[in-house]
Design a protein with these regions (language model features):
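C-terminal catalytic "cap/lid" subdomain
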Residues: 1-146
Length: 146
């Protein structure tokens, strides 16, 4: 979300699988069921900003990217923690985990836990630090590569 992450990187295309993971992990771009239905029907989705216009991104059947393609946050109910999740083919990775955790610790943000699965890693931080943590993880794992 460019409103939260000032140097967000626009992707021309993103795979259904990566967008589905981002939606499930908190991205408020598309609902996860809409992505699953589009994938089942082979229907590409064009996502654009309603404020800025522009080319946007296409969610479609494409080779899944081998890099980190997105970072999102999820604040659940009454929990005092928020999950900052990075998604992409480069994950999970001990190297990427160290890079992200180091960036967060340098900013004096405590990482309470790290969870990983196929194509994602989540970093659990205090809810009040979520937006700053999202920016830091984005900068460490995506912007540094651009």
């Amino acid at each position: 979300d460019p409103r939260i992450c000032k140097n967000a990187v626009r992707r021309e295309e993103i795979s259904y699988g990566d967008m589905l993971l981002l939606a499930q992990k908190g991205a408020q771009v598309l609902h996860d069921r809409s992505v699953a239905l589009a994938q089942a029907g082979g229907v590409p989705i064009t996502v654009r900003s309603c404020r800025e216009g522009g080319a946007g991104s296409i969610v479609c059947k494409t080779d899944e990217d081998a890099s980190v393609v997105g970072v999102t946050q999820k604040k659940s109910g009454r929990s005092r923690l928020a999950a900052i999740t990075a998604v992409g083919g480069a994950l999970p990775s001990i190297e990427k985990e160290k890079i992200a955790v180091t960036a967060l610790e340098r900013a004096e943000i405590t990482v309470f836990a790290v969870a990983a699965g196929e194509r994602f890693m989540s970093f659990y931080v205090v809810r009040d630090d979520a937006e700053r943590a999202l920016q830091l993880v984005h900068d460490a794992l995506i912007a540094a590569k651009e």
